[in-house]
Swiss-Prot record:
Name this protein carries in UniProt: Anthocyanin regulatory Lc protein
Polar residues composition-biased segments: 481-495
Native source species: Zea mays (Maize)
Cross-referenced Gene3D superfamilies: Helix-loop-helix DNA-binding domain
Pfam family, one: HLH
GO molecular function: DNA binding; protein dimerization activity
SMART domains linked to this entry: HLH (SM00353)
GO CC terms, sorted: nucleus
Comp. bias regions, Basic and acidic residues: 508-519
Family statement drawn from the similarity comment of this UniProt entry: Belongs to the bHLH protein family.
């Protein structure tokens, strides 16, 4: 489509003047704040891609998730708002430099924003910077081609063909969008509220662009000092906009003639160039930005555009419908040339087209005319980067390519190592707790103390086992095989039967006249000896006591067993020749277990009492 020569030239002049860019930022801020909308973007013709509308500048006026202040100086509300827009612009440039150059991103100030500091609306604002439109594509392209404003309500419900950022708008809760052609480009305004179309809002939003912004000679020196201080500070004071006064000034400028306008423009340029420090700083920033853009692989958009938003496989591919040719440009170009010829040097009021922008009307309009061609991002690499950051792909930490993949793999390996180490430590702690529960007493609960107490306790147990074995040797030897005489009458004669009995074993005694009768173990112990054996298996406990018979001995033994919280299951007892043999099967009553040596000590105390 042939573009208006005057509008393209006006946009190029705007991009080439740093002072005009600073003025543009203040105008965008005034436009967004005058109607209290969330953001303002300015789209103009790109130098690297002729005939394509790209992002030029913007102002953010929406919600802030995380605010970072680089210095300790207290800022006003206006300065904080302007600082947020600058921080978002710096973050966008940092993302470009980190992915486009394939180099490590330079060190950034402490007050700079990171991707995790942005909210949904701020992400929508930053990602919108990566888009580009041909005339007739999307909302900015339609407004630029028709030279009329376009109002979109319920933006989150619009189709991706007419509004490619519909998905982003839905996540950011953007409801209403307004695009107005101004100063050779397109002004885009957006808000999270549903605002019906109103002509007065359009007039208020564009009033800052029609009002003369050049500084005039002040009758008092104090006014000049204030203006110079404001210029040095780099901030803008947002005043109440008066559209009627602005239109009066425009009419006065038009009546003054072309010569007066040219003279005033020269004065404005001379005064803007007077501040050398500010000019050099702004020029340096712009040159750095364009040098980054030149280093990146910027490919021209293909001329035969398709109907639908096409992104390659790594960027959320959306299938396209059948391609349709773009509308013939002859009539539109002729109309634009005729409109430029009849237009005044300063833009005045424009004819509006109040068309209800809904889903049904969009489909009907697309059925009449050829659907607008899909928008293709001007810079694919930055947009892919931003989408990876939105999806949590970790692109901010990596510089792209194999380096990013290696860093991601190393990060995953480190995370797995940390998790395995944490599980190992938890298992060790559990084992130390079990070991601590087996000790009878412990003074400290740290790992070194538990190990030391365990070693000492094992040595003590080993010593006691040796003592028990040494004390049982003289009593067990004569009792292993004992000869007893059992006398019974047999056919009138007394017959002596010699029987060998193993100590501690069970036997049947048909000699006593009762078959299959189980007898308690036969004990043979020396006088004055006693023996206690404790066997623990899970919750089952086997107690064997051998000692001299005394009165109340059984009572003391069972009192000791009761004090140890043992439930008695079975008892076998015998008391031949003044010695008592006791075999008790018991079970732990509660969940806790008693150490065997504690049971042995309690039984020894019970049988040792007099």
């Amino acid at each position: 489509m042939a573009l208006s020569a005057s509008r393209v030239q006006q946009a190029e002049e705007l991009l080439q003047r740093p002072a005009e860019r600073q003025l543009m930022r203040s105008q965008l801020a005034a436009a967004a704040r005058s109607i209290n909308w969330s953001y303002a973007l300015f789209w103009s013709i790109s130098d690297t891609q002729p005939g394509v509308l790209t992002w030029t500048d913007g102002f953010y006026n929406g919600e802030v998730k995380t605010r970072k202040i680089s210095n300790s100086v207290e800022l006003t509300s206006d300065q904080l708002v302007m600082q947020r827009s600058d921080q978002l612009r710096e973050l966008y440039e940092a993302l470009l430099s980190g992915e486009g150059d394939r180099r490590a991103a330079p060190a950034r100030p402490a007050g700079s924003l990171s991707p995790e500091d942005l909210g949904d609306t701020e992400w929508y604002y930053v990602v919108s910077m990566t888009y580009a439109f041909r005339p007739g594509q999307g909302l900015p392209g339609r407004s630029f081609a028709s030279d009329e404003h376009v109002w979109l309500c319920n933006a989150h419900l619009a189709g991706s063909k007419a509004f490619p950022r519909a998905l982003l708008a839905k996540s950011a809760s953007i409801q209403s969008i307004l695009c107005i052609p101004v100063m050779g480009g397109v002004l885009e305004l957006g808000t999270t509220d549903t605002v019906p179309e109103a002509p007065d809002l359009v007039s208020r939003a564009t009033a800052a662009f029609w009002e003369p912004q050049c500084p005039s000679s002040s009758p008092s020196g104090r006014a000049n000092e204030t203006g110079e201080a404001a210029a040095d500070d780099g901030t803008f004071a947002f005043e109440e906009l008066d559209h009627n006064n602005g239109m009066d000034d425009i009419e006065a400028m038009t009546a003054a003639g072309g010569h007066g306008q040219e003279e005033e423009l020269r004065l404005r340029e001379a005064e803007a160039l007077s501040d050398d420090a500010s000019l050099e700083h702004i020029t340096k920033e712009i040159e750095e930005f364009y040098s980054l853009c030149d280093e990146m692989d910027l490919q021209a958009l293909p001329l035969p555009l398709e109907d639908g938003w096409t992104v390659d496989a790594s960027n959320f591919e959306v299938p396209c419908s059948s391609p349709q040719p773009a509308p013939p440009p002859v009539d539109r170009a002729t109309a634009n040339v005729a409109a430029d010829a009849s237009r005044a040097p300063v833009y005045g009021s424009r004819a509006t087209s109040f068309m209800a922008w809904t889903r049904s009307s969009q489909q009907s309009s697309c059925s009449d005319d050829a659907a607008p061609a899909a928008v293709v991002p001007a810079i694919e690499e930055p947009q892919r980067l931003l989408k990876k950051v939105v999806a949590g792909g970790g692109a901010w930490e990596s510089c792209g390519g194999a380096t990013g993949a290696a860093q991601e793999m190393s990060g995953t390996g480190t995370k797995n190592h940390v998790m395995s180490e944490r599980k190992r430590r938890e298992k060790l702690n559990e084992m130390f707790l079990v070991l601590k529960s087996l000790l009878p007493s412990i003074h400290r609960v740290n790992k070194a103390s538990i190990l030391a107490e365990t070693i000492a306790y094992l040595k003590e147990l080993q010593r006691r086992v040796q003592e028990l074995e040494s004390s049982r040797e003289p009593a067990s030897r004569p009792s292993e095989t004992t000869t007893r005489l059992i006398t019974r009458p047999s056919r009138g004669n007394n017959e002596s039967v010699r029987k060998e009995v193993c100590a501690g074993s069970k036997r049947k005694s048909p000699e006593l006249g009762r078959d299959d009768v189980e007898r308690p173990p036969v004990l043979t112990m020396d006088a004055g000896t006693s023996n206690v054996t404790v066997t623990v298996s899970d919750k089952d406990v086997l107690l064997e006591v051998q000692c001299r018979w005394e009165e109340l001995l059984m009572t003391r033994v069972f009192d000791a067993i009761k004090s140890l919280h043992l439930d008695v299951l079975s008892v076998q007892a015998s008391a031949p020749d003044g010695f008592m043999g006791l075999k008790i099967r018991a079970q732990f009553a509660g969940s806790g277990a008693v150490v065997p040596w504690m049971i042995s000590e309690a039984l020894r105390k019970a049988i040792g009492k007099r």
